[in-house]
């Protein structure tokens, strides 16, 4: 006859084993990062990696990368040359705009559009390629979306 302490110990071992199995199964269900390789007109290959947590996803069509959360468009991203980036910077001064942050290789600004305020982001993601992203999200929310997207030049 087994004592009360032995039954409890075996019972605890079974519970611990089932918890470990459950944790391992749940870990296998986790979302992995999504990757897309963009090939802009600059000639570079830019690997884009998205953290898919919180129901984020992305797709590429006609050279534009669209980032979604729960199937709602969060941001549109194009890949442009340094010359196009400089032309875009020069053109914004001809319209009402507000700069949120400007550095040598980074700018974020807002402009009114037909569908309301649009926030733009431009910064290099390769040796010859710049990200040109647009969103209707406020700057703080847009920064959170951008923090989920990672770029690596030259990857296939």
Where do the protein language model's features map onto the residues?
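Bacterial N-terminal signal peptides that target proteins for export
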Residues: 6-17
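C-terminal motif of bacterial Sec signal peptides marking the signal peptidase cleavage site
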Residues: 26-28
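Bacterial signal peptide processing site
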Residues: 30-32
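Secretory pathway targeting signatures of secreted, lumenal, and periplasmic proteins
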Residues: 42-91, 110
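Surface-exposed amphipathic alpha-helical segments
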Residues: 48-56, 132-156
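Short, surface-exposed beta-strand/loop "edge" segments at domain boundaries and coil↔beta transitions
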Residues: 72-78, 85-86, 114-120, 129-132, ...
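Signature of long, low-cysteine stretches enriched in small and polar/charged residues
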Residues: 92-137
């Amino acid at each position: 006859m087994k004592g009360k302490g032995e039954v409890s110990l075996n019972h605890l071992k079974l519970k611990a084993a089932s918890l470990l199995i459950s944790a391992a199964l749940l870990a296998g269900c986790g979302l992995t990062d999504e990757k897309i390789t963009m090939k802009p007109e600059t000639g570079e290959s830019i690997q884009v990696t998205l953290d898919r947590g919180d129901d984020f996803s992305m797709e590429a069509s006609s050279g534009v990368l669209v980032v979604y959360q729960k199937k709602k468009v969060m941001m549109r991203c194009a890949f442009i040359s340094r010359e196009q980036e400089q032309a875009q910077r020069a053109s914004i001064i001809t319209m009402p705009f507000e700069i949120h942050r400007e550095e040598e290789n980074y700018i974020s600004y807002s402009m009114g559009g037909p569908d309301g305020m649009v926030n733009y982001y431009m910064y290099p993601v390769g040796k010859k390629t710049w990200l040109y992203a647009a969103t209707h999200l406020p700057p703080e929310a847009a920064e959170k979306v951008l923090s989920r997207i990672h770029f690596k030049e030259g990857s296939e």
